[in-house]
C-alpha cells in the first residue's frame, strides 16, 4: 500500500501526555507532507496538455539530472510523465517541469515547518488533535518564506484583466 492512513489516537488507558500527542501529530504531519510531495504535480507543457509527474526521491534525482542536461544545451531530453512512454522533451518543457517540482516541494516543506512550529506551541491535547495538514496556519507561525509562497499562489489564482 503506497499511502498509509492515520487513525486518531484512542486512549488505551495509559497516561497520555501533551508531549506524546504532540510528537505523534508532528510525525503524522511529516508523513502527510512527504506523501504529498511524492504524489507529485500536474504540469501544463508547451503542447497545451497537462501531465502528471511523481516526485519520489528517485524522481527528484532524475529531474536534477535533466535540469543539468538542459543547462548543458542538450536540445531534446528523454523523460516520461507518469504512466507514459519515454519521449523527448524540449529544454523549455524540462525547465517548466523542474521549476514546478521545485516550487511544489519548497511550498510543502516550508508549510510543514510552520505547521510544526504551530503544533509545538499548542498546550492541549484537543487543540493538537484538531490540527490537519493543509489548514491555515496562524500568522504568528508563518515564516516570511511561507507568506511569500502563499502570496505567489494567491496572485497566480487571480486572472489578469
Question: Model-predicted segments: where are they?
Answer:
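A preference for well-ordered globular domain cores
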Residues: 3-161
Amino acid at each position: 500500500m503506497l499511502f498509509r492512513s492515520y487513525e486518531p489516537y484512542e486512549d488505551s488507558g495509559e497516561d497520555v501526555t501533551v508531549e506524546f500527542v504532540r510528537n505523534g501529530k508532528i510525525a503524522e504531519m511529516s508523513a502527510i507532507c512527504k506523501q504529498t510531495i511524492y504524489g507529485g504535480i500536474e504540469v501544463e507543457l508547451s503542447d497545451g496538455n497537462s501531465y502528471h509527474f511523481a516526485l519520489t526521491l528517485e524522481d527528484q534525482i532524475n529531474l536534477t539530472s535533466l535540469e543539468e542536461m538542459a543547462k548543458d544545451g542538450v536540445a531534446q531530453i528523454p523523460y516520461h510523465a507518469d504512466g507514459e512512454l519515454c519521449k523527448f522533451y524540449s529544454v523549455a518543457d524540462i525547465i517548466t517541469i523542474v521549476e514546478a517540482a521545485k516550487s511544489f516541494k519548497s511550498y510543502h516543506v516550508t508549510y510543514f515547518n510552520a505547521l510544526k512550529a504551530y503544533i509545538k506551541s499548542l498546550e492541549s491535547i484537543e487543540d493538537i488533535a484538531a490540527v490537519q495538514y493543509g489548514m491555515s496556519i496562524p500568522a504568528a507561525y508563518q515564516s516570511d518564506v511561507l507568506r511569500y509562497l502563499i502570496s505567489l499562489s494567491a496572485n497566480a489564482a487571480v486572472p489578469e484583466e
